[in-house]
Amino acid sequence: MSEALSVPAAEGENTVTASESPDLAATSARAEKVGKQEKPEKAEKQSPMMLQYHRIKADHPDTLLFYRMGDFYELFHDDAEKAARLLDITLTARGQSGGVPIRMAGIPFHSADQYLARLVKLGESVAICEQIGDPATSKGPVERKVVRIVTPGTLTDAALLPDKSDTFLLAVHQQTTRRGVSKTGLAWLNLASGELRLMECDAAQLSRELERIRPAEVLYTDGMDLPTLTCARTRLPEWHFDQEAGTRRLREQIGVASLEPFGCSGLGAALGAAGALLNYAATTQGQSLRHVQGVTVERESEFVGLDSATRRNLELTETLRGTESPTLFSLLDTCATTMGSRALRHWLHHPLRDPALPRARQQAIGALITQGPDGLRAVLRKLADVERITARLALLSARPRDLSSLRDTLRALPDVQAATVSSEDAPLLAQTLEEIDIPQDCLELLIRAVADEPSTVIRDGGVIARGYDSELDELRDISENCGQFLIDLETRERERTGITNLRVEYNRVHGFYIEVTNGQADKVPDDYRRRQTLKNAERYITPELKAFEDKALSAQDRALAREKQLYDGLLQALLPHIGSLRRVAGALARLDVLATLAERAKTLDWVQPERVQENVIDISQGRHPVVEGQLAAESVAFIANDCQLNEARKLLLITGPNMGGKSTFMRQTALIVLLACVGAWVPARRAVIGPVDRIFTRIGAADDLAGGRSTFMVEMTEAAAILHNATPSSLVLMDEIGRGTSTFDGLALAWAIARHLLSHNRSHTLFATHYFELTQLPVEFPQAANVHLSAVEHGDGIVFLHAVQDGPASQSYGLQVAQLAGVPQPVIRAARKHLAWLEEQSADATPTPQMDLFSAQSSPSADDEDDKSAGQSAVPPAQAATLEALADIDPDSLSPREALEALYRLKSISETARTV
């Protein structure tokens, strides 16, 4: 029975009904008048279908509801208005209900993914409501239910996910222990891979951890204040985060009696967060999370600490301008697979303190360089994204081409093994190859079951291979042999009737028919029954053709139904292989990253760093990898530099001109240290790196308008974080600290901060400054040393040598840099004149008291300075005014009109002088 949709009629109109069949979905069903989203006072005015809609929508009030009607997803009322605005689709209003216009909008089912992707990117969540009943047998509305909820943190479809970055759903919960200590528990899940991680930290560290993990969606409790986030946020009741329930839920998910082997002992708030996370994820997917088969507990002491400022300033995966290139990741990412690209991104954001694993990675890279990584990388390029396909298998949402891609990838694994030689000197490489263990049963099943080139979706058929199921083969034979039957029937009927132009054909609307032109109508036999009349012909059906039609069309429908049944069974049969497929995916991703880093090291002339226990950073001929790459594109050589930091040389005071390369030198040192801790080779001739626990950067600054903080406040906040947290094993980069306030305040702060870093933190520090007074610091602290970026003057210009040399710089060359930047010549000349006056005042005048940091202070006006200059000069005032006016004139840049105006000004000055 077809499903009818009826609505209250607007005044003066009749109630409209329409069949909700796929054939009418794009016409009648899309134009139906529907009731208000709020449940109407008089339920009898609503159709059964709209009552069904309101009931389902009531369970999902905060999400957009995609309500399946034939070949469309419909949105009604407020959802329709919101979707129309966000997606730029048509919003219709047809009729009224209770005086309110009835709004609706829709999107085609076959293109839903692109609309979902746009909504998720905007932070919206969408409930997908599908028809699960059969319209042909339903009495009343077709049965529907929400089969999944798409949220920013629970994406698994390939069309919705970024290829080269992970999407995390994170739950955070704060808990106070019996001793009154507040702990913050984090649990985050990559639903597209099944990777689950837990961590506990102090509340003060929450912002840093969120910056590291960068979740797409955060679950949190009522009343909890979250740091400023750009991701989606979902508030859940407190009881969702119950620790005991969370522990139970996690044990059930992993299938173990105890969580101790996973390192969960002592965790509290994180277990509550894990319970909320798993329940939320399972609810959105509408089923269990079979691919989440383990948990990893992270400790703060495991990774080299990188706060948000450091990640931003080092431009690991995003530039300061917010673009993806040029960054360290964009330079390194030549990965053959998207799995490898995601793993590489993770490695760069998670450098390790313990040198054991980085050293093992570097050994594997060395072995691959010796073997030559090109052959392996060529094989890896043929592989599919096994990690995400496995997740979709576990969620029973894999599509036919996922299965064919998985089959082809498993077939190629022997080639991967053959292209890589295990080495005793590279145990990690040997371990990785062992983990690429081909699941033969899984491969054989896929070979038998899946067609060589299956259709995109199961409803189109052609997915299950021939020979896999005899019943399906028989049904296919019936429907596929129609052509030959029609040819044979047409031949027989022409001979029987004598109608030479008789045709036997088929179309979707009228089925099978025999067509006879009007001129041959007198020859039509009595057993022909008219099916359709055309202008110049008649179409007929015979008992034989009708019997075949029933059989053929029935066979096609039954074949599609059988194929869907077999496909569902195939997905179930593949579930036991989820664990082995996840291990293979992890090993392939790791191998791809190692091969990529080997190729990069070989191509870019990088070296394997030496990791030692001594607290030292000793880099010979180090280079900034990204800047070097940019210069190479312009055929310009990068100037390499050395950097030595040790117990006797803890702080380098770096002076030199703007644009001389101070910031580049500092950043390249940090990047070399980070790459060594990641396990990559490094851009240097030689690098010896000791223990590193954190990397801090205080480089550049900008107003925090949203937070109400000035540039100087941002600068001091970051400096305070460094002074409170840096240790002797930390690397600190300080660039022009104190520049955001008055000269003496800034100098005093810079001096005190440098002294504190030397005397208290004792960190490895690169301290760039334009305060030349700081170059006297090594007199008080022998652990400090002066270096400078050299430059030479050439005429009125300057040539930057970009070479780091011992000792302080002689000057900053600020005016020369301003000239290079295109500052007008009159301004440059005025600046030179004023600089000379300032230097004279500095040498001769008594010092003026320095005002307090927050006090207003004024500097002499230009007029005052000119008066002072004139007063100290023997030149008469009138002559001085003439000379100054002449100095401001650039004859080569004047137009004729400007030259004439300048001449009039000089004449005016002369006349004024005579009058005086």
Swiss-Prot record:
SUPFAM superfamilies cross-referenced by the UniProt entry: DNA repair protein MutS, domain I (SSF55271), DNA repair protein MutS, domain II (SSF53150), DNA repair protein MutS, domain III (SSF48334), P-loop containing nucleoside triphosphate hydrolases (SSF52540)
Alphabetized Pfam families for the sequence: MutS_I, MutS_II, MutS_III, MutS_IV, MutS_V
Entry annotated with the keyword DNA-binding: yes
Residues binding ATP: G656, P657, N658, M659, G660, G661, K662, S663
Keywords assigned by UniProt, alphabetized: ATP-binding, DNA damage, DNA repair, DNA-binding, Nucleotide-binding
Cell inner membrane is among the record's keywords: no
Gene Ontology cellular component terms for the protein in this record: cytosol
Compositionally biased intervals (Polar residues): 843-861
GO annotation, biological process: mismatch repair
Domain of life: Bacteria
MF terms in GO: ATP binding; ATP-dependent DNA damage sensor activity; damaged DNA binding; mismatched DNA binding
Coiled coil region boundaries: none
UniProt family annotation: Belongs to the DNA mismatch repair MutS family.
Function: This protein is involved in the repair of mismatches in DNA. It is possible that it carries out the mismatch recognition step. This protein has a weak ATPase activity.
Protein name: DNA mismatch repair protein MutS
Organism lineage string: Bacteria, Pseudomonadati, Pseudomonadota, Betaproteobacteria, Burkholderiales
Gene: mutS
